[in-house]
Structure formats: C-alpha cells, structure tokens
C-alpha cells in the first residue's frame, strides 16, 4: 500500500458509517497471535481506533486484566476479538458484559473446531449476556471493511460492493439471492487491484447486504496470524 493515509481514511469512514464517532466508545482488542507479528493490518486499524476512542487497549491473553478494565470503564465498549479467542473467553469465564458490543473477526484459523456461525454466535450470546454478535469482515487484500451488526448479515460502506459468482465458472455473476462465491469491489484499493475474488461462499441480497455461509471446499486457511506458526 502506497499510502497509509488512504487506509486510515477508509477504516475510519467505515467505522463511522456503522458505529458513529470513535470517541463515543472504548475499544478493547483481544487479538492473540496477530499481536505477535509485525505488519498486521488488523492490529494497525485497531491501534488507530483505540487512540481515537481515547480508552481501551490490546490484551494478548490476559483475560483477567481485560475483564477488570472493562468492568471499571463507564463508556460504551466494543470488544473486538478474533473468533477463537472470544470462544476461549466465553468458555473459561462466561462474563456478563455491560454496555458492550461483542465483535468477532478472523475466524477459527484452525485453532478451534469449525461450527455453524449461528451456533457459534449463540454460544457467545449466552456466555456474554448480549443479544447479538457483531462481526468485522476484511482481509489483507482489501483496504475497506464490511460490518455485521447481528445475524451474520454484512453491509458495506458506500465505496465497497460485494457480488456473487458461480463457483464453477468465475466469469458468471449470479442474480441477487443466489448462493455462490463472493467477489468484492473495493474502490479504496487505489494503488492495487480493486476487484477481489475470494474463496468465501455466501449470498448477496438486492439491498447490497450479504451473508457468509462458509468457504469453498478445500479452500486454503487464511489469516496473517498463521504466519507465527
């Protein structure tokens, strides 16, 4: 990426689109393994947003400190965690979180059993005492992010769009409501390719929102945190 300023403008704009001003929130980031290597775009984004929030911080695997600090924080909070770390927190502590949006990202990456997203979110909701699990969808190849505020239904900022393709014919785009591979158009990829073909499978509806249902069979496991292995 030639300009980090463009990346910052994109992720700030996407965050404000769905959550308003960062200063309204405290952001707590539970991102083990992402923090153990340099160059993670997710860590960079979280770090800048934490600074704009003015409160919160990174927690590698110190769950006691995380829960203690969140309990003492009077502001509305976002707990941004990689999926397998949130599951660990739910199993070990099952804390009832007050004034908190729980936001998962990153998937299991081979660290935990893959289960249906609805079942996983139900486990987290029951453990944390929240009504819905939010999600952030992004990847190293994208400058922008999509967000789900519950129900695994993602929405994009205005400069990003998702379309559905036939998994057996990459040149055939499918009509709204069809299930297939997801292609992403990200106009913030100014100095790189703005058209990304992913190995995620899902459905795009006529309002532009999309649902992720899994990965194409035999697709590679993705995630920059895996580089620490």
What are these regions (language model features)?
Residues 11-46:
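Conserved AMP-binding loop of ANL adenylate-forming enzymes
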Residues 23-26, 39, 47-229:
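Active-site glycine/GP-rich loop and adjacent strand/helix microenvironment
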Residues 1-12:
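Conserved AMP-binding A3 loop
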Residues 3, 30, 34, 112:
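Conserved aromatic-histidine-acidic binding/catalytic patches
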